[in-house]
Every structure is written in C-alpha cells, then in structure tokens.
UniProtKB/Swiss-Prot annotation:
Keyword field: Aminotransferase, Cytoplasm, Glutamine amidotransferase, Repeat, Transferase
Taxonomy, superkingdom: Bacteria
Name the UniProt record assigns to this protein: Glutamine--fructose-6-phosphate aminotransferase [isomerizing]
UniProt enzyme class: transferase
EC number(s) stated in the UniProt entry for this protein: 2.6.1.16
GO biological process, one term: protein N-linked glycosylation
Active site: C2, K603
Main location, first listed in the record: cytoplasm
Any Pfam family matching the protein: SIS
PROSITE patterns xref list: GATASE_TYPE_2, SIS
Domain SIS residue range list: 284-423, 456-598
Source organism of this protein record: Bradyrhizobium diazoefficiens (strain JCM 10833 / BCRC 13528 / IAM 13628 / NBRC 14792 / USDA 110)
InterPro entries named among the record's database cross-references: GATase_2_dom, GFAT, GFAT_N, GlmS/AgaS_SIS, GlmS/FrlB_SIS, Ntn_hydrolases_N, SIS_dom, SIS_dom_sf
C-alpha cells in the first residue's frame, strides 16, 4: 500500500526522500510527494504517476530543507490526482498517511460545522485538520497529535512535521507498519527496513497503538495509554543492492530466475543434508500427535501455497486441513479447537487481514505458526512460532520466488508432521527429502523452457480469456497461474479443478479459448486427458504442461506441449510454477503493461 518516509537530517533531504521512496515502489502507488521545512515554512512538491514525475518537479523547483517527509500514494479515498497526493499540509503542519480512517465522515462533518474547508477527497485531510485545529487552539505539536490520535478509528501509519520546528517529527502506528531508523545526529521514519536501508542498519518497529516523538538525537516512544516504552533495536541488512534489477528488464524476471538459488537456501535451512532428514530451524512448542486439525489462512498467492500444503498435510500426516481466505476467516467466527494448529502465510508479514485472523486464532487458544519472508514483521512477532522463507526481498508486485519458498517451507513442515505422527517411516522421509533436494536443479531445468514460452505468449496475448486446469496439487497451481496472468497482463483468466470442467466452465470453450492444462504424469493423469479431449472436441486451444511420460501418453493434440523434467510427483507445484510464471510474465511484456507495478495493485496490503 502507501509508502512513508521521514528524515531529520543534516543536509538537504529532498533527494534522499525520493531515493527512499524508490525503494518503496514495490508496494504499489499512483502518485507521490515530499514536504520539507524551508526555513520556518512548509513547502511541498507532488506529482501524479511515477516518481520520475516528482523528480522533474523537484528539478524545476528544488527544496533545500533538512527536515522532510515523503509518500507514495495508493488511492483508497479519492482519485489518484495531484490534489489528493500526500503530503497534505496547512501553514502549521504536514502529514503523510498509510491506511484508512474509518470514522472520517463523522469527523469531517464535525470539522466542517466548525468552519474547516476541505480541499481534497481523502480521509487523510481529516487527520491534518484535527491536528491543525488543535494547534490553532494553543496546543503544542506533541499534545495536538496525542489528542488527535485519540479521535481516530481505523488502520493508519502517520508521519508529521511542523512549521517553525526543524528538530521535530512525530510518527504513529495503528495497524500498518512503521519503523524508526537511528542515525548519527539524524533520525528516520519509514514504512519498512528497505526504505531506511541506505541510511541506517539499526531500526525499531512501533507496535500497534504506539506513537513516537523524534528529534535528531532521540526517539521517545509512547504506547496507546501514553506511557513511555522501549522497543527493541534490530540490526538489519537492507542494502541498496537489494532493489537492483541487475541485467533483467523487470524485477519479476529477475525474481523468477532467482528461484533455484533462493529455494535452495530455504531447503538448506530446513533439511539436514548429512542425515537426509527434515530439521526445522526452530523447536515447535507443540506435538503434532496432539493436533487434530490444521487451519491455514492467507491471502492471494500465499493462499494457493496453503492450498497445495493442504494436500501434503493430509497425505503425509493424515491431518484434516482447512484453507481459508483471511478476509473471510477473520469475520466468520470459525470454531477452533484449543490446542489445534493455525498456520498463517504472508510474504510481507504485514497483510492486514492475515494479521487480524492470527489475532483471532490466538484468542481462541490454538497454536500459531507464521510462514513469512520478513522475520521482523508484525505477523512474525505476534506468532507463537516463525518459519522464515529465505526468498530475499521480492520487489515485483506479483509474487514468484516468495510463493515457491513458501511451498518449500510447508513441504518440510508437512513431512515433519507425518514423521511425528507415525504416518511416515524413516524410509518414507528419506525418499521425500530426496525429492525436495532435487527441486533447485529441476527449477533450473524448467527455466530452459523460456524461449518456447515466450513464443507461446504471443498467442496468449491475442486472447480475451484463458482457462487453467489442474488436478490434485496442480489445481491450486492452476488458480495461481490464472491469478498471475490477470494480475500483470490484464487478460481475464480463471483456474478450475479439471474435474469441474463439465460443471460450468466448458460452456466457455470455443476456438478462441486457450486452455492451460497443468498435468504431470501421475495417478490422475488419464482423468485429466479425458478433460483435454472435452476441450479439443469444442475447438479449444490446449497448452499442456507435463513431463516426458505425459507428453508421450497424452492422446489429445495440443497447440503447445511444454515438457517438464521428471520428478517426484508430490512436489511438482514448486517446479511447474516456473513455466506458469514465465507465461504470465512474457504475455504481460507483449501486452505492454507495467509488469512490476500492475495497475490498482499493491505489494503489501496493510489495510482491509
């Protein structure tokens, strides 16, 4: 969602603010702006669209202040215009905001009755005028912000600077993340560690309800009750190289090609190569023998990783698994048995719905495990157990390497569960671990299909609709493939269990419809072939992703057959994810879309 940065510096900060905002581009945005203290007065520069437009504004009208805040906006209230872009400001105060103010209507009506004139369509302007009104009434900045925060309902991260005070910045968090960066005679505020990477290696994360008063030499943190508190200082290593595309055209391409390496790193964290056994990086605070049911909760691509894991837990450990979309789970008051297990999957570790679901599960007394890519994130900090993925920062909005690393973690956890429950023998475990050890090499092999897929993408780019089909663990991958294609190419796509074809989707099949069939040769392959025959009979254009045996046994002519390496049937989603991602990527490139920052999407969804 929106990105926030603030700097109390010793040199002019406008250029630093923009550089930091570039590191937050992955979150998604449609406008951007900065505000600095010029002498005793606040000055803003804002622009619609990409940061290069803001840079042009700053070239034409430079800012020289050493105190400033910056923002990338992802529109929620109000259209993506310059007028609605942050920072918002009066003569006395400037503010940046990530989140949603839920009681903005009643606060706006109250302020308008008192004579306040609003100039934007945003809920953020309510915060601005609340603080400005309190300043007008004689309150000092710290007291004004404290009183204003008490009036707000919703999810928000806020940053404030004030006219006439070059050594003051205030931040507040209620939901979306906000970090403090500690420098030498300088202090920083940012949405995450990546934003602050060029400036400092020492940060603290505010907790929900916290607010902080920053000067160049101090950070005074208060909790929601107004008590001064200490928050742990964390060392991080978010260097500038982390957001470099190297020789790739897009971050997404780079991240697809990084998968053999990062999945290998994740594998090495979870498997003892010497003994060929699963070796989790943490001791679980529960015994799988006592678990009767697992609930897996996530959003988007992460939920499809959870869906794949459902098959693994049920097969390896004979444990029933329920997979929930977090935005539904958090409100349906699902009955959870105390002592059972809930797994929460999130790349950022800040997904608002997943975090709310986690808090519900904790209140119900179940064990909680977080599978996250950011071990210092809120979901990680609030979970009983953290199982990190080692994907490294993922900048492209459409998840690729985080997804496959999540699968690697979940596969190991499912094997550990099966072993603990006596459902897997030592021999079974060794066989499965052998299959996992082969995954990085097989992913490298899968990348060799890229030229074939690039040609295929020209055909897909002509289509209005695309259907993805799969059975077993290939069904969630079909859902993921459809999501990837529509996310970045804007072509409508749907994923279905192949057996559901005749229960509705078959009505869509005609000569213009590409149908991507994900079908490694396994015990349900023949069933999938029968579905392919149904597609062929109606003129559909079949794109088959299978192995050599499947290509040989398929009795239906395909437009294209993408032959994948032979591998352990249980873990095909990790390897078949590669051509699925490449197909979406190259189709989007042909369509000319913004691959890394597709329209209307945000990387880290920190509000509902």
């Amino acid at each position: 969602m929106c990105g926030i940065v603030g700097i109390l510096g010793r040199e002019p900060v406008a250029e630093q603010l923009v550089d930091s905002l570039k590191r937050l581009e992955y979150r998604g945005y449609d406008s951007a702006g900065v505000a600095t203290l010029e002498g005793r007065h606040l000055e803003r520069r804002r622009a619609e669209g990409k940061l290069k437009n803001l840079e042009k504004r700053l070239e034409a009208e430079p800012l020289k202040g050493t105190t400033g805040i910056g923002h990338t906006r992802w529109a929620t209230h109000g259209k993506p215009t310059v007028n609605n872009a942050h920072p918002h400001a009066t003569e006395r105060v400037a503010v940046v905001h990530n989140g949603i103010i839920e009681n903005f209507r009643e606060l706006r009506e109250e302020l308008e009755k008192n004579g306040t004139v609003f100039h934007t369509e945003t809920d953020t302007e309510i915060v601005l005028h609340l603080v400005d009104d309190l300043l007008t009434r004689g309150n000092k900045p710290v007291e004004a912000v404290k009183l204003a925060l008490a009036r707000l309902r919703g999810a928000f991260a806020l940053g404030f600077i004030f006219a006439g005070d070059n050594d003051l910045m205030i931040g507040a968090r209620n939901g979306p993340p906000l970090a403090i960066g500690y420098g030498d005679g300088e202090m920083y505020l940012g949405s995450d560690a990546i934003a602050l990477g060029p400036f400092t290696d020492t940060i603290s994360y505010l907790e929900d309800g916290d607010w902080v008063v920053l000067t160049r030499n101090s950070a005074t943190i208060f909790d929601k009750d107004g008590h001064a508190v200490q928050r742990e200082k964390i060392k991080h290593a978010a260097s500038t190289s982390l957001v470099d595309k190297a020789n790739y055209r897009h971050f997404m391409a780079k991240e697809i090609h990084e998968q053999p390496e990062v999945v290998g790193h994740t594998l090495a964290r979870y498997v003892d190569m010497a003994t060929e056994r699963v070796s989790l990086p943490v001791k679980l605070p529960f015994d799988f023998k006592n678990i009767q049911r697992i609930n897996i909760t996530a959003c988007g691509t992460a939920s499809y990783a959870g869906f794949v894991a459902k098959y693994w837990f049920e097969r390896f450990a004979r444990l029933p698994v329920e997979v929930d979309v977090a935005s539904e789970f958090r409100y349906r008051e699902a009955p959870l048995r105390k002592g059972d297990l809930a797994i929460f999957i999130s790349q950022s570790g800040e997904t608002a719905d997943t975090l709310a679901a986690l808090r519900y599960a904790k209140a119900e007394g179940v064990h909680t495990v977080a599978v996250v890519n950011v071990p210092t994130s809120t979901i990680a900090r609030e979970s009983e157990t953290v199982l990190p993925t080692l994907a490294g920062p993922e900048i492209g909005v459409a998840s690729t390497k985080a997804f496959t690393c999540q699968l690697m973690v979940l596969a190991n956890l499912a094997i550990a569960a099966g072993k603990a429950r006596g459902e897997l023998s030592d021999e079974d475990e060794t066989k499965l671990v052998h299959g996992l050890v082969e995954i990085p090499r097989l992913m490298s092999d899968a990348l060799t299909t890229e030229l074939q897929i690039e040609k295929l993408a020209r055909e897909i780019a002509k289509s209005r609709d695309v259907l993805y089909l799969g059975r077993g663990t290939s069904f969630p991958l079909a859902l993921e493939g459809a999501l990837k294609l529509k996310e970045i190419s804007y072509i409508h796509a749907e994923g279905y269990a192949a057996g559901e074809l005749k229960h509705g989707p078959i009505a869509l099949i005609d000569e213009t419809m590409p149908v991507v069939v994900i079908a490694p040769y396994d015990r349900v392959f023949e069933k999938t072939v029968s579905n392919m025959q149904e597609v062929a009979a109606r003129g559909g254009k079949i794109i088959l992703m299978t192995d050599a045996k499947g290509a040989e046994e398929a009795t239906v002519e395909s437009l294209v057959t993408i032959v994948m390496p032979d591998m352990a049937a249980a873990f095909t989603p990790m390897v078949y994810a590669v051509p699925v991602q490449l197909l979406a990527y190259h189709t989007a490139v042909i369509m000319g879309t913004d691959v890394d920052q597709p329209r209307n999407l945000a990387k880290s969804v920190t509000v509902e």
